[in-house]
Amino acid sequence: MNILFLTLLKIDTLEIRGIYHDLMREFSSHGHKIYIISPTERKENKPSSLSTEGNVHFLNIRTLNVQKTNIIEKGFATLSIEHVFLRGVKKYFSDVKFDLVLYSTPPITFTKVIDYVKNKDGAKSYLLLKDIFPQNAVDMKMMSKNGFIYKFFRKKEHQLYKISDQIGCMSEANRQYIYTHNPKINREKVSVNPNSIQPQPFEEISAENKAAIKKKNGLPIDKKIFIYGGNLGIPQGLDFLLETISATEKDPKMFFLVVGSGTEFDRIQKWFNQNNPQNAKLISGLPKQDYDDLMKVCDVGMIFLHKDFTIPNFPSRLLPYLEYKLPVLVAADPNTDIGTEVEKHNCGFAVLTGDIEKMKFALDSFCNMEDEKFEKLRNNSRNYLEENFLVSQSYQLIMKQFDLQNNNSL
């Protein structure tokens, strides 16, 4: 098959790992021809480019800044990107007959591209629903439900759902949310297809190497290390992380490692500079291999979500924690099911964002846990990953929706 993938995440190689890289690599491994369109943002100061890696073609097309920029430019970029991507399809891939078009949210503004490819080629369309916009912006007080902007984007959201032949949601709570808030949608085309990766074989790190990595990164040898890694933005509700660090500063059993980048990084760095916490360390975003090395010496992975969310987020940062056998501590709003799923699979604990007493209890529970029980949580984490979040499973779910498993000649 010829498969078109539209994404806001810049992809110019499949040699690195990530949820979209891994999924495209899985499709490629089955012999499909892959065409990926993704941005080259204005801040990179580079022109559009087309490159090839085996049976995978990468069109990195110049756009406005989309990621980690101010809300005004992000808004203009979101509005203009479907026109930019559509020009890219017409200019670079006009001679390709696509069988399937895959796309993820954000953004919700790919409708014209999808419609063009479906009408031209009779292609099937599959939405990987990773974000529910504009409601997430309403939750974060970035727009009002009564305003023109919300109504405009809500219409765009409806159009995207309507044009999608199938919609893959990250979790059951995601699916139920879509049903409840979009009653006209055909329920048969909405299914659960969670974030997924191709995990690496797990190898335990020796005590000697573990100590060396800790020393290199200024981490304590004799404390449980709780890592928060990933985006540092408003949706993560990181004030609760800072409150947690402050509330446990005198506890000798635990240490917090915060690794990432995002719109809130400068504010968090300022807080670290002003408060100089002795039980925590902040590191700017790292290359994936360096970040993976750090995770090998950490004990518990942390997930934070803003308390005001009404949409059920399911952050992909869960997957690398599980890959490295880290038990998970989730601090989230009451509408997501990520915490209940972690507890159901016995690989961690969940608390409501803002409940500092329950947070301290969960932290103490990890620190005081017997080694045998903690090891069981670690094994449960890896099992949870391998049973639910493999790209091979995501691939089969997509192919099954269109009954394409045995029809690669399309």
Feature map (PLM): residue ranges:
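Membrane-proximal helix-turn-helix segments that form the acceptor-binding/catalytic region
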Residues: T109-K112, Y116-K120, F148-C169
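A short helix/loop element that forms part of the nucleotide-sugar donor recognition site in Leloir-type
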Residues: S48-L50, E203-L219, E372
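Nucleotide-sugar-dependent
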Residues: L14, Q236, P287-K296, G301-L322, ...
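Nucleotide-activated donor-binding/catalytic signature segment of Leloir-type glycosyltransferases, i.e.
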Residues: D251, V259-G260, F265-D292
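Carbohydrate-associated surface elements
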Residues: T40, A173, N193-S196
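Conserved donor-binding/catalytic core segment of Leloir-type glycosyltransferases
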Residues: P220-Q236, L242-I245, R378
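A charged, aromatic-enriched C-terminal amphipathic alpha-helix characteristic of glycosyltransferases
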Residues: G354, K358, N368-F402
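N-terminal subdomain of nucleotide-sugar transferases
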Residues: M1-L50, G54-H57, I245-T248, L410
